[in-house]
Amino acid sequence: IGWYFAGDEESMRSKVRRMASLPHAAHPGEAFVYGYNTDILGALVEEISGQTLGAFLDENIFSPLGMKDTYFFVPGDKAKQLSTVYALTEDGLQRAPSKDQVETEPNGSNTLFYYGQGHYLENSISGNRSYSGGAGAVSTAKDYALFLEMLLNDGESNGRRILSRKSVELMIQNHLDPQIPYRSGSGFGLGFNIVTNLGQFGSMGTE
């Protein structure tokens, strides 16, 4: 199945059908498993709406909010707006390789590296078939600010209802039962990590 779908030639709906044959890592309520849930939800949106996830989100979220630079596959005339992606390697900081370049682990297994930005371009090698709900869209700080502003306004933007108030409330609630182990001071909402205790939540920083 793989772990990163944005550059795949296989559609998400096809992948989800294959996922359905796999055993569960845990059943609902047993444990927190960071996995493919958002990708599966994106495939469900496509199945129910009859649209690609990109078309559905553009019609219902991106365009109503005025998010003019948010895409699953960036048009060629805007390709230069993409940031160059770099990866930290044993030889220092290098431009991230393409999908087919891999790093071989000591045990002989191949681990896919960070992706370059080519997989987010319209008419890329993927054929623009895999609309990954979990990590497929790219945007700008300005566009994302419009989305966050809508959440802060309980689902409204300039007087227009984008999401229901209840949907926003559910997004930012911690849905993990207290007995399920997770990061100290944190919980998980609908697609977001939730800080439940500022005094416990923290980070040692990055290297």
Stretches with model-predicted labels:
Residues I1-G202:
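Short, surface-exposed loop or secondary-structure junction motifs
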